[in-house]
A protein has these predicted regions:
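Positively charged n-region of N-terminal signal peptides that target proteins for export
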Residues: 2-8, 25
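Intrinsically disordered, low-complexity, compositionally biased regions/tails
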Residues: 17, 149, 170, 218, ...
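Sec-dependent signal peptide hydrophobic core
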Residues: 8-16
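Secreted, short cysteine-rich peptides and small extracellular cysteine-rich domains stabilized by multiple disulfide
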Residues: 184-230
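C-terminal motif of bacterial Sec signal peptides marking the signal peptidase cleavage site
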Residues: 19-22
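N-terminal propeptides/leader regions of secreted preproproteins
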Residues: 24-184
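Generic signature of intrinsically disordered, low-complexity, basic-rich segments
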Residues: 15, 32-35, 216
Length: 230
């Protein structure tokens, strides 16, 4: 009996410890550097994780990224797949450009794990992701002549884009189009990114901000801890 009681106390204690650490981990996840936005997301997690992709595209612009960070892996994949479909269908591309975009689309359809933040990826997944992105970006820049601004509009934001006169305009949820001024947003880049910076042609400057759970870099795979310099 004494052995059974000790075993029961051990199991209860272990479960309590695991619960404590899981709560600690949840509390240490930041969906936004803005405390009010972060609190709102945490209060609405259950409804956010039922949100459809079309609804995400239409929510307030300032909440898009915090909500995206709270999405399940399947939701994130759906957002990027729809964004890439829209990029291919609603803009004019040369055949080789469409093929290159399709390559990214196909890869993402098979590798939803690539949308896990880089710091949380399994080593073999991170290695495969790095190899693919390096090759994909190199071909886009050297063979297709795509600018950093165009690449940032395609893989640096999940928002839809419209290309006019060679300039990629990002479509905002308020119906306006424009070149995104990243310095207007809180914590919009990763200062130690190893694959791709969302700053396009500028540098990411570290600032006092809690690192968020993804949302920056190539397909939002980096956390955000800084601001793009002008």
């Amino acid at each position: 009996v004494e052995f059974i009681m000790k075993k029961s106390f051990f199991i209860v204690g272990l479960l309590s410890l695991l619960t404590f650490f899981s709560c600690q981990n949840e509390e240490n996840v930041y969906y936004s550097c803005d405390e009010a936005e972060d609190a709102w997301v945490k209060e609405n997690l259950s409804s956010i994780r039922k949100m459809e992709t079309t609804e995400w595209f239409s929510i307030s612009e300032k909440l898009k990224l915090p909500v995206y960070r709270a999405f399940s892996l399947e939701q994130k994949q759906s957002v990027w797949m729809e964004k890439l479909e829209d990029v291919m269908m609603n803009n004019e591309w040369k055949t080789e450009e469409i093929e290159h975009l399709q390559q990214l689309y196909d890869a993402l359809s098979m590798h939803s794990e690539w949308l896990i933040p880089n710091t949380e990826k399994a080593e073999e997944d991170f290695d495969a992701f790095k190899i693919f992105t390096y090759k994909w970006l190199a071909f886009a820049q050297k063979e297709l002549g795509w600018s950093n601004d165009l690449l940032s509009a395609i893989v640096g934001t999940a928002n839809r884009i419209k290309i006019m006169n060679g300039i990629a305009l990002i479509e905002f949820s308020n119906g306006l189009n424009g070149v995104k001024n990243r310095s207007e947003f809180t914590c919009n880049c990763n200062s130690s990114n190893v694959i791709w910076t969302t700053c396009s042609t500028s540098n990411c400057i570290t600032r006092s901000c809690s690192t968020t759970n993804g949302g920056c870099g190539f397909l939002g795979s980096d956390g955000c801890d800084g601001l793009c310099s002008k």
